[in-house]
């Protein structure tokens, strides 16, 4: 199991939960990055003592330098700084939970530095799937999915040695907070209702995307690149309880599924400890 980890997007929902896992596993957090939430980032720095941090917002980075001048942590700024954190020498694994397309370039930087990547940034593969997967093959790097559905598929595939035996991948979807509502009922839903996911505790953007089902469309593309699968062989089924996270079906019509409580710390921890499993927090 790894001992040193870098976490990109450490002040977001996945990043905060990743730090909980790192704390429970007693990992050495060598580098962190954030967009602009320097108050929380400072708390994280003072607890985990990373050697390197980066802040996208350059003004916020300047402020952070002043706030932690009593510490030995180096503060970098801008996208260049984020990419430097992604390629940090000491890190054995880079967990990328940056939101949106901003996560693509740091992923590429980590791969070029020959770092295995725990990927929670689906836009990396939606926008640059061919580039990322080809580069990972070139540098001998593993891309380990953190999204619960893709982590489930990844786990189900551990016993599959021949892709030709696969018939299809089956992603599950809760349907979000508005499943079963009519088009007329959807006209007057509020932001508060949209952000009230029935099962998962997630960031605002992905919660909205889940409510509209847009997130599932992105996940199909992500799965196609992660598992080198034709989109026609990827299905989606509604499973409101979010206990079955995803399934794989073989050509003999047998099905293997991965189940668990809807807690993102479980796939986060599996990505960090892979191929081992340890007691969860």
Question: Could you tell me what each predicted segment is?
Answer:
Residues 1-281:
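Catalytic, metal-anchored helix/loop core of enzyme active sites in primary metabolism
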